[in-house]
């Protein structure tokens, strides 16, 4: 079983971290915009695993609840 198949066992809304592509599907924000947002040094909803960006889903939810625009 590969990593993608394992990730499909747990729904996105229950995972602690999600990929950029999953975050884009989850929020409706494009991958490019999410990448731009996570490039900021003050971004607290990104977690780096080597050179891979993982999105902290709960922190992203909090950010979006308080954001006026992205």
Where are these regions (language model features)?
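Generic extreme N-terminus detector
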Residues: 4-5, 41
